[in-house]
Amino acid sequence: EPLSVFIDPVFLSTLPTRELLSGFAEVIKHALIADKSYWELILNSHPLGNADWEPIIQKSVAIKQSIVEADPTEKGFRKVLNFGHTIGHAVESLSLEGGRTPLTHGESVAIGMICESYLSERKRKMNKEELSSISTLITSLYEHRVFEDMDTHRLIELMKNDKKNKDDSISFTLLDGIG
């Protein structure tokens, strides 16, 4: 564990738009997994506008820190931090294959969050309005990607290799709702 962490939001102004959005995917994830009121703030804080980054960063750091401190060995609740990552890692890996345009980690996780939100709704854990809200925000921020039918099989192969899986089944992090 680090002794301290230094964060200066001023450096965000030096990032290309694509990298800023990549990092913002983790902010979205923190709101979705932990705090509905934070989600409402995120809905009104477009990352390319004049967002006040300091409270956003403080809230995301506090959420992640509280989860990690509550479950330092990732035996239980900390797994919620994997939301969007099972599918996201597979999408990111696929984007690096065969001359495709590589996706950033955040772009891939954003796709994964939409997919895992859809799975959450299908399992009757999340309502349709929340799924729609998540989908609308993410698709408004991130470039649309189209996957071919043949990619589905490759994505499943890649998901099967995920370190979080147990007993040859793919593990997803599903949400009961926003926050």
Regions found by a protein language model. Name each.
Residues 107-115:
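Small-residue-rich helix-loop
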Residues 1-44:
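A glycine/threonine-rich phosphate-anchoring loop and its flanking beta-alpha core
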Residues 24-28, 56-67, 81, 113, ...:
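Short alpha-helical scaffolding segments that buttress acidic/His motifs in well-ordered protein cores
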Residues 93, 114-122:
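Short glycine/serine- and small hydrophobic-enriched flexible loop segments
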Residues 25-27, 125-179:
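C-terminal charged capping/lid subdomain of soluble metabolic enzymes
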